[in-house]
C-alpha cells in the first residue's frame, strides 16, 4: 500500500511539473538528455533521480535557474562520474605517502590513484583499466571543483564534496 502511495505521489508531482511553465522546461531538458545518449542504466538512473528530486522540490519558477544550472553540469558528466559522485557517502578513507604541502589539510595532488585503488577494492573492482578510469574521473571531479582531499601525513585522508559537489549530490541521491 505504501508503494502505491509513493507511485501516486510521484505521478502527481510529475503532473504538477509538466503543467508548470518552468517545470515543463526542466522535465523536457531531462527528456532531451535521455534522447541524446544510447540507453545506459546508470545514466537513466541518475536522470530519474534528478527528475524525482526536481519534481519533489516544487517551486519550479523560483528554483528554475538552479535546476537548469545543475542539469547542465549533469549533462556534461559521464554516467560513471555521476555514479562515483552519487556514492560520496560511501567513499573510503585511505592512506598514502604524501610528499608535498597542504593548506589547512587540503591536498591538491597525488591522492587520485591511492584513493581510486582503495575505492575500487571496496567495490570489488580489480580490472586495472577500470581503476585507471576511476583515477581519471577523480581527477576530473577535483579539477571541476566537485571534490577536495583532506588529511595530513601519517593520518587517513578523505575526499569531501565541495559546495558545488554537494549541490549535484542532492540531485543524484534519494
Give the predicted meaning of each segment.
Residues 1-58:
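Charge-rich, amphipathic alpha-helical segments
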Residues 37, 41-174:
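Long, helix-rich, hydrophobic modules that act as membrane-proximal anchors or helical bundle/coiled-coil regulators
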